[in-house]
Structures are given as structure tokens and as C-alpha cells.
Amino acid sequence: MGDDELAEIRRQRMMQMQQQQMAEQDQIQRQQQMQAQIQSVLMQVMEPEARERLNTIRLTKPEFAASVEQQIVSLAQSGRLRQKITDEQLRQLLTQIVPQKKEFNIRRVG
């Protein structure tokens, strides 16, 4: 391989890396915009106490909080929310969503 071929390979590699970096930045920007839209909707449809509870849940269970947020946003977009969600209503929603834990009673026989 000559110097020209190596330079061309390096140039192509640099272009690929730049394109990949730009694509990643675009993806991050889209995610940030989507998150901002979700937060905007939540501010419109939830009382401050309910948002605070959801933020507290996000600290311990981020995937679960994201799922709850998506459900609330879909309820708001479908027009099924007639008033702001209060803390008590959020609690009720959470009890419906949280999967029931199976309890195991282990008894020693013998």
C-alpha cells in the first residue's frame, strides 16, 4: 500500500466517524426534545404533588416511572383526562399498574 492509499483510507475512516458522531448527536437531541414534550404534557395534566411523587419514583425505578409517564401522556392525548391528576389519583393509578407481588410462605416441615 502506498501513502496515497493509506491517506485515502484514513480520510474515509474519519468521514465515517464524523457521520456516526453526527447521527448520535441527532439521536440525543431527538430524545431530549421528546422528553421535554413529555414533561410539558405532565406539567399540564398533573398537580405539583403528583409530579413530585412521580419524580420520587423515578429516582428508584426509572423504567417504571417512564412507563407511568407514557400512560399518563397517552391518556392526556386521547382526551380521557378531564381534570388534573391529583396525588391521590396517581396513587390509585400506581396501585393498578404495579404488578401484584407473589408471596411465598416457606415452612419447615420435619
Swiss-Prot record:
InterPro entries the UniProt entry points to: DNA_bind_arc (IPR022889), PDCD5-like (IPR002836), PDCD5-like_sf (IPR036883)
Database matches in SUPFAM superfamilies: Double-stranded DNA-binding domain
GO cellular component, one term: cytosol
Family the entry assigns: Belongs to the PDCD5 family.
Gene3D superfamilies xref list: PDCD5-like
The protein's name in its UniProt record: DNA-binding protein Mlab_1482
NCBIfam families according to UniProt: PRK04239.1
One protein family per Pfam: dsDNA_bind
